[in-house]
Every structure is written in C-alpha cells, then in structure tokens.
A protein has these predicted regions:
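Helicase motor core with emphasis on the C-terminal RecA-like subdomain
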Residues: 6, 10-15, 19-23, 27-39, ...
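Basic/polar N-terminal segments that are highly enriched at the extreme N-terminus
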Residues: 1-4
Length: 314
C-alpha cells in the first residue's frame, strides 16, 4: 500500500469512522488529491459526498462546494461539524446569513480553519464574495448536483451555467469536481463541456440497486385510507410521500396527523426557516413521514428511508 493509500485509509477512519472505501470512492479521491479535474456519476446512496469531503479535509486551503439547495448545504455542514472539534471546519455562505455571521465565515477561511465552504451558485456571482475568495487559498471547486448545469437535465438551473467563468476569476488552474446521480450521456457531455473539463477523469458507478423494488398499486377513491393503512403497517419507519400540488401536500399531511401518523408537509411555498425546521424534524427522527412536492429530497442524506410513495403520477 502506497503512502497516499495509507494516509487515505487512516484519514477515512479518523474523520468518518469507516475502515474501507465504498465502490469507486478511493480512485475518485486519489484523482482529486492529485489536483486533477474529476467527473463522478454515482447513484444516490453511492457515497458521492465523501468523495470531496475527505480530500477537502486532507488538502491545504478551502474547497468550495456549489450546491443548489439551502437544505442540502445545511445537512452536510451539520454532518461535517459533527466529526470535528473545529466548528468552523465547514460553513455555508448564502443570503440568509447576518453581517456578523458572514464576518465569522470569512475569518475562519482566512485563518485556514474552514475546509469546506458550501455556496449556492447565486452567492458566487456576488462581486464581494468573488473578490474575497480570490485572495484566499482554494483547494478545489466541487459542483454537486452537476446535472443542474444542463438544459437537457430534469432540474436545469440557469445560474449553474455561469460557474466556469466565475471559477476562472477565482484563480488559475483550480481543479474542478463535477458530481451527479442522474445524467444521461447527453447531459454528461453538456456538463463536461460547460465546466470546461474535457480532460477530466470520469468515474461512473453501476446504477443497479438490488435493495430497491418498485410496486404499482391501483389508485382507488379511498387513496388516503390506503396510504394511512400502508404507513401504519410500517409504523416507526421513515418515508416520503410525493404529491404534485402544494395544496394536496398540506391536505394529506393533515389527514395523516389526524389519524395518528407523525407527519409534516414540505414545499417551496414555505419560508426557508419553516422548510429547515421540517427537514430537521425528519432527519432527527421527530417525525416519521414527510409529505412533499419535488422541492424536497435532492441530496437529503438519511440512510433509513424505507418507503417512497408517489401519490400522483410524476
């Protein structure tokens, strides 16, 4: 085992408590530690986050992680802070922070405390943030949920397409890591082209998930009663129920609550504080079920979700 491998395995054990890597993780991390551009395509649950978290902790400087959702960023920052004595090891930089909080974030980055800085793409377009980040040592930029770049993807975000130009402004030869769980060949090509990483090493994991199975049931006029029955048969297990409309989300969550199921609603119509509260309740096992629109779910790291119900055809 080479010195890099020895360091890698001891760091994996030290920071994350794992004795071995999963799937392609080790090769991905070695490529990142060698300062190469890297493109990672892994299914949900494949361990994508660790692919940039571990090298960020090991490398000198701060890694920028571009993420589309405040909920996702908060989830990951909390997890990283949980493995370190340094509260400032990971930070979010977004519009919800007060001036005092922004000052603290910048101090921690300048002092070399912060290893992971999570930002929404909009935050990177702010001139004051660009000017600040130009002056500090950056280890790499990781673009999570990279399919948001592609107009051919299912979750296109226009602000993602400006990332390459901004990264160029932050410094020369900053390695770029693109990560996604959902990319057709056309979307993959678009991501690589848009991020200007044609020399990137591509790591693509198998998408076969033998632990998952699908079931299609007839939707009766008593669908609410059917869902209540199913959830009660799986009492105490975590689950997500997706609905097409916000109105239906709130109605169904209320019906579940009235029938003794611990459930919360979640959709983009709630303010950030409420969304964050409901997400935390689900992650911390305070409720069993989230009834949601597609605003919920991207990047949520909860290892024990046991069922997902689609109330309406997506």
């Amino acid at each position: 085992m080479s010195l890099m491998n020895t360091d890698l395995h001891s760091s994996l054990k030290k920071y994350f408590g794992f004795s071995k890597f999963k799937g392609l993780q080790e090769g991905v991390i070695q490529n990142i530690l060698s300062d190469n551009d890297t493109f990672v395509i892994m299914p949900t649950g494949g361990g994508k986050s660790l692919c940039y978290q571990l090298p960020a902790i090991m490398k000198e400087g701060t890694a920028i992680v571009v993420s589309p959702l405040i909920a996702l960023m908060k989830n990951q920052v909390d997890a990283i802070r949980g493995i370190s004595e340094q509260h400032g090891i990971a930070h979010v930089l977004n519009s919800s922070l007060t001036k005092t909080e922004v000052k603290q974030v910048k101090e921690d980055i300048t002092n070399g405390v912060t290893k992971l800085l999570y930002v929404a793409p909009e935050s990177l377009t702010k001139e004051e943030n660009v000017e600040f980040l130009k002056k500090v040592k950056l280890s790499f930029v990781a673009v999570d949920e990279a399919h948001c770049i592609s107009e051919w993807g299912h979750d296109f975000r226009p602000e993602y397409r400006n990332l390459r130009g901004i990264i160029n402004r932050l410094g020369d030869n900053i390695p770029i890591i693109g990560l996604t769980a959902t990319a057709t060949p056309k979307v993959q090509e678009d991501i690589i082209k848009n991020l200007g990483m044609t020399d990137a090493k591509v790591f693509k994991a198998s998408f076969n998930r033998p632990n998952l199975f699908y079931e299609v049931r007839p939707k009766t006029k008593d669908v609410d009663a059917d869902i209540i029955r199913f959830v009660k048969q799986n009492q105490g297990k975590s689950g997500i129920i997706y609905c097409l409309s916000r109105k239906r989300v709130e109605e169904l969550a209320q019906v579940l609550q009235v029938n003794g199921v611990s459930a919360v609603p979640y959709h983009a119509g709630f303010d950030a504080k409420t969304r964050s509260k409901y997400q935390d309740m689900f992650l911390m096992e305070e409720v069993d079920v989230v009834v949601a629109t597609i605003a919920f779910g991207m990047g949520i790291d909860k290892p024990d979700v046991r069922f997902v119900i689609h109330h309406d055809i997506p």
